[in-house]
């Protein structure tokens, strides 16, 4: 049965982390990882007494949140048909977005429209408010999980929509596991979004060991050549 009713909500104490890690290569060698974390637990008051944690990490340049399914006797296999994650934008700003769920291909050119003209969008979707504030909605650490698109539900509100699986469930995982981070990068300018390290910080650390043999290269993909008729 779904975990959705008769839930008790408890919140832990905020935790602050401030450290620095080194990239094997990239725009910057050292990345500062500075955030405040807050964990909220939702637990069934009766019955199976299953629990789900929602973890928030707040950075100077935005925030990320994810759902965590701890190891517990009454929850072994988790089947996720959809998420009820929503993003409610305060105003009808200007959106830079690429369509999702079109019938003939996955890649499209980006459109620049009012937010309420968006139907379904791939992420990242970027919105510029009337004050010039920029917000980019995306995800991080998407590992063994369905990709997230956005479908406008009404007005300037969007709901996360998972890429379908082969069954009724978009995701089937064994507990314990975590969903990807849902991310909001926030900046006073578009350039500030490019400078943000939020998604890098929320991605999983390197698990490959020695990666010194990785070498940066330039690559031109065939699909973009077709788009540009090269």
Cite the ranges covered by each PLM segment:
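N-terminal accessory beta-strand-rich subdomains and adjacent acidic, glycine-rich linkers
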Residues: 1-213
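Structural preference for beta-strand elements that scaffold enzyme active sites
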Residues: 180, 217-221
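Catalytic cores of extracellular degradative/oxidative enzymes
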Residues: 206-212, 220-230
